[in-house]
């Protein structure tokens, strides 16, 4: 982990901590912390312009800082496994990720789109998967979606073919799941 006044400076400092230069084509997951989430555009643009970046590099947000994430070493393999599972249409038929080349970086305006959020329990240092999605306009976050709202967003944007809803009606738990949904 490293910090800098620019992306290039932070990456240079991170490279100095290693015994060899990182090869970005090996990376499938880009984690952006709370500082980067205020305006993700420069980070996504940097890696989209990086010739060595993998074409399917998927970006995720995390509420943890680099220091907090480094304290959760036990769950890093879970994060990588979940990220790899979510890249592309998963078994739940929901495509929660986009590669950095699919994300709409509209000129100088910045990111217009969404990024999934990896959830963690800081106290228990436990990884909890993707439970939220942040919507961005001109690079800045403007809405956080969870549960049914997140699923509906994916469905309406052609990124899901099923919908699972769990709710309460008059004190009773109601659950339903639809499959093979197709918008026409």
Give short role names for the model-derived ranges.
Residues 1-184:
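Membrane-proximal alpha-helical signals and transmembrane carboxylates
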């Amino acid at each position: 982990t490293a910090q800098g006044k620019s992306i290039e400076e932070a990456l240079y400092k991170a490279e100095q901590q290693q015994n060899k230069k990182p090869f970005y084509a090996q990376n499938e997951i880009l984690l952006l912390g709370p500082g980067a989430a205020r305006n993700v555009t420069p980070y996504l643009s940097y890696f989209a312009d990086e010739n060595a970046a993998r074409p399917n590099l998927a970006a995720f947000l995390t509420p943890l800082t680099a220091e907090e994430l480094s304290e959760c070493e036990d769950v890093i393999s879970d994060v990588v496994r979940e990220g790899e599972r979510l890249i592309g249409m998963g078994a739940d038929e929901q495509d929660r990720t986009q590669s950095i080349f699919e994300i709409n970086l509209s000129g100088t305006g910045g990111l217009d789109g969404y990024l999934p959020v990896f959830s963690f329990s800081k106290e228990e240092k436990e990884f909890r998967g993707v439970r939220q999605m942040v919507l961005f306009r001109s690079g800045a976050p403007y809405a956080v979606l969870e549960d049914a709202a997140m699923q509906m967003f994916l469905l309406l944007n052609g990124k899901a073919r099923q919908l699972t809803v769990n709710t309460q009606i008059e004190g009773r738990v109601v659950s339903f799941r639809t499959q093979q949904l197709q918008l026409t």
